[in-house]
Amino acid sequence: MRTSQYLLSTLKETPADAEVISHQLMLRAGMIRKLASGLYTWLPTGLRVLKKVENIVREEMNNAGAIEVSMPVVQPADLWQESGRWEQYGPELLRFVDRGERPFVLGPTHEEVITDLVRNELSSYKQLPLNFFQIQTKFRDEVRPRFGVMRSREFLMKDAYSFHTSQESLQETYDAMYAAYSRIFSRMGLDFRAVQADTGSIGGNASHEFQVLAQSGEDDIVFSDVSDYAANIELAEAIAPQTPRAAATQEMTLVDTPNAKTIAELVEQFNLPIEKTVKTLLVKAAKDSKSTLVALLVRGDHELNEVKAEKLPHVASPLTFATEEEIRAVINAGPGSLGPVNMPIPVIIDRTVAAMSDFAAGANIDGKHYFGINWDRDVATPVVADIRNVVAGDPSPDGEGTLLIKRGIEVGHIFQLGTKYSEALKASVQGEDGRNQILTMGCYGIGVTRVVAAAIEQNFDERGIVWPDAIAPFQVAILPMNMHKSFRVQELAEKLYSELRAQGIEVLMDDRKERPGVMFADMELIGIPHTIVIGDRNLDNDDIEYKYRRSGKKSLIKTGDIVDYLVKAIKG
């Protein structure tokens, strides 16, 4: 490709509304342009990267035995009503009616459509297992689209759905998809972790997320410094303290704390170690509970894990924090003065809190706290559960090493769905025993557009994008200096351009009448891995300057050797 016949569209300045580096660089490198909130046009450079990501995904899905299909973006509402998600899904589901007043949705996902297809096409266990995939546009009406294509409303996704007559069969496919995803992200040159995850609104049993490590990530991922253990922080178990609870050394004392409504204020004003404080959070109780509220207690320096808390039998789902009005109606004190002593509602404490002694907590009286509280002396030990987020340095749940925490961008997610959708849509086949058998499902997603942004978040420097070779828009950039004034520069550039293309190498030759500084800046911004610079001065010695984008290393290579050198560097 020649720049004179190409839409380069690079920008010198960073757009003001671009928050994260991937959004900034995708705009500056001429990869995307915003059409409306959360909607982007992919320009040629961006589309080349997107297609490479898509091709790697497709190759590995085919290698894993999945079958490609294509399902409509527009879906009839009756399928969503049949599955129950018409009512469950929030405003992210874009609903509309056609000219005949028939309701439809723009698909955010395709569980209903594929299950409908299978229930009409399959009739016998002999046809299973099957794993269908597509690479298709999705639409989710995000309340606040941000970070460019990282969280856009319209996006490209690879979604796959497998169907089985046994859990063993599902597990085999699940393991195959796990391995395929690992190959996909490895081939793309990404630093990623596969982590245990919560199944969330999708439902089902087992679940793993594939997270690309990046400081801009929205998820905290946890992994052992010794073993292969890794999990989303939502799911990571906080191990109970291994040392026994220390004996009481203080008497419980009621203390006036009128200006201490938070743990931070309590610690600062009374010079308390934060590890000796407890915070109390009140949430709505489950419908079948005798109480309207439940008290959850975590250590002052720990954070409540809302996913864990929501799964407790006494707690309402979704987790809902009580308002101050609701708290005062039950406790007669504000949220800054709550604690376990004389608490009139059910109390659940974290494992770490259960191991505490001589601690401070609210007295359930405005402006007062108890200091020197001890379990079983001042208040009975209540229900104990793992309800906090782990912190760096905690022991790994598998007993090997300690935990590290890094930020991650979720680019893939696999689920064992079980029978949630097949039961709702009555998808069954005749089993081996002749009886009707509801199908067991798995689903497996990759955010194809998000992968592009995540790759940039991991691969950039002060000059621009530093693409992994496998997904770069071009493999080689040819920069002929003053080619319009030097016949030998132009002649060699054209010769190398033809020879490299004949070797199947993707080349961008900058044949613009531009200053060298502009040409260098654009190629580094775009992030092409290999650059060759052809200039009269080096040609006097029969040399070409070669530069590898990732290392920045430059070297002089003889003109007769450069093609073989590049072929070897690119193809191995």
From Swiss-Prot:
One of its GO terms (molecular function) is ATP binding. Coiled coil: none annotated. Its EC number is 6.1.1.15. InterPro entries: aa-tRNA-synt_IIb (IPR002314), aa-tRNA-synth_II (IPR006195), aa-tRNA-synth_II/BPL/LPL (IPR045864), Anticodon-bd (IPR004154), Anticodon-bd_dom_sf (IPR036621), Pro-tRNA-ligase_IIa (IPR002316), Pro-tRNA-synth_IIa_bac-type (IPR004500), Pro-tRNA-Synthase_IIa_type1 (IPR023717). It is found in: Cytoplasm. It is an enzyme of class 6 (ligase). GO terms for cellular component: cytosol. Signal peptide: none annotated. The keyword Ligase applies. One of its GO terms (biological process) is prolyl-tRNA aminoacylation. Keywords: Aminoacyl-tRNA synthetase, ATP-binding, Cytoplasm, Ligase, Nucleotide-binding, Protein biosynthesis. Gene3D superfamilies: Anticodon-binding domain, Bira Bifunctional Protein, Domain 2, YbaK/aminoacyl-tRNA synthetase-associated domain. SUPFAM superfamilies: Class II aaRS ABD-related, Class II aaRS and biotin synthetases, YbaK/ProRS associated domain. It catalyses: tRNA(Pro) + L-proline + ATP = L-prolyl-tRNA(Pro) + AMP + diphosphate. Belongs to the class-II aminoacyl-tRNA synthetase family. ProS type 1 subfamily. HAMAP family: Pro_tRNA_synth_type1. Homodimer. Catalyzes the attachment of proline to tRNA(Pro) in a two-step reaction: proline is first activated by ATP to form Pro-AMP and then transferred to the acceptor end of tRNA(Pro). As ProRS can inadvertently accommodate and process non-cognate amino acids such as alanine and cysteine, to avoid such errors it has two additional distinct editing activities against alanine. One activity is designated as 'pretransfer' editing and involves the tRNA(Pro)-independent hydrolysis of activated Ala-AMP. NCBIfam families: PRK09194.1, proS_fam_II. Consists of three domains: the N-terminal catalytic domain, the editing domain and the C-terminal anticodon-binding domain. PANTHER family: MITOCHONDRIAL RIBOSOME PROTEIN L39/PROLYL-TRNA LIGASE FAMILY MEMBER, PROLINE--TRNA LIGASE. This is Proline--tRNA ligase.
